[in-house]
Curated annotation (Swiss-Prot):
Originating organism: Schistosoma japonicum
Family assignment from sequence similarity: Belongs to the immunogenic miracidial antigen family.
Comp. bias intervals (Acidic residues): 64-85
Origin organism lineage: Eukaryota, Metazoa, Spiralia, Lophotrochozoa, Platyhelminthes
Domain of life: Eukaryota
UniProt biased composition (Polar residues): 90-103
Protein name: Immunogenic miracidial antigen 8I'
InterPro entries the UniProt entry points to: Miracidia_Ag_8I
Region Disordered: start-end pairs: 61-139
Amino acid sequence: MCVCRVDILSRFDIALSLLQSLTHSHTVLRHLCFLPTIIYKHLCEFTISFSSPVISTGQHIDVGDEDYHDGDDDVDYTDDVDDVDDPHGSPSQLLQGGYQRNQHYGGGNYQSGYYRPNKQHGNGYGGQYPKKYGSGYKH
């Protein structure tokens, strides 16, 4: 076992001395030592960028075949903050208590669970908290 380890180390020393003689520079060798780390870092960034999709505001969300949505093939699922008349509700409208027309889960109005100004009943805490802290369930 010790012989194998010495053999591997001697091969490494031979390779290192060959590299030194070829490059005639220690700075190149220093940078070559970091090459596997740099390659690994770039590979990790590359796989992360392709493995986890990021949906930003205004980006089209692909839902596949749209023929089953209300008979309308041109349904636009973009989330545009400036589009106030959109029945889906923009993110800012949802945070302010807007409604979202959820076509994927049976339609109707889906309440966001945040502050709802028109909510008339309490939240089940007996006045312990203000009414704006709702439970988030559909009432």
